[in-house]
């Protein structure tokens, strides 16, 4: 069985990051995140949103890691976060599920792809 600890550390790091500083060192150069709207954004774009203060993270809690699978130098994970944040002054309280792809780059696991659900995850569907 593959060691999932580095992926778990990345998930926990993302879940507990309070600003944009976690993102750039922990993503691949071609990283994209797909927002609930379906629109993709690069890591630099996400950092720009945080730095502009349009996006203000108030709290984030990892509720559950549903799955981690590793296949050589590629891995994927599915996890749910309880997030409170404000976007352009409007507060959101979301229970969102993330699906992420990770790549092992020179021995270091990094986020390569992230897709976030709308903030209405029903945890009973994961039982």
Predicted regions and their residues:
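Beta-strand residues in well-ordered beta-sheet regions across diverse protein folds
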Residues: 34, 78-80, 112
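Short, surface-exposed coil-to-beta transition loops
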Residues: 60-63, 78-80, 93-98
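Short beta-strand edge/turn micro-motifs at domain boundaries
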Residues: 95-125
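Short, cysteine-centered beta-strand-loop-beta hairpins and adjacent loop/turn segments enriched
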Residues: 56, 84-93
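Short, low-complexity N-terminal intrinsically disordered segments enriched in polar/charged residues
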Residues: 1-25, 29, 73, 123-127
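A solvent-exposed, acidic/Ser-Thr-rich amphipathic alpha-helical stretch
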Residues: 6, 20-71
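A short hydrophobic beta-strand element
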Residues: 72-83
């Amino acid at each position: 069985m593959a060691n999932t600890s580095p992926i778990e550390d990345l998930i926990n790091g993302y879940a507990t990051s309070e600003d944009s500083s976690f993102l750039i060192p922990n993503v691949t150069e071609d990283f994209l995140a797909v927002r609930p709207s379906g629109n993709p954004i690069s890591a630099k774009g996400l950092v720009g949103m945080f730095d502009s203060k349009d996006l203000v993270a108030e709290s984030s809690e990892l509720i559950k890691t549903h799955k981690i699978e590793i296949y050589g130098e590629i891995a994927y994970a599915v996890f749910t976060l309880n997030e409170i944040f404000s976007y352009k002054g409007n507060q959101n309280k979301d229970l969102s599920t993330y699906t992420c792809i990770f790549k092992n780059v020179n021995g270091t696991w990094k986020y390569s792809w992230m897709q976030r659900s709308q903030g209405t995850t029903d945890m009973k569907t994961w039982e």
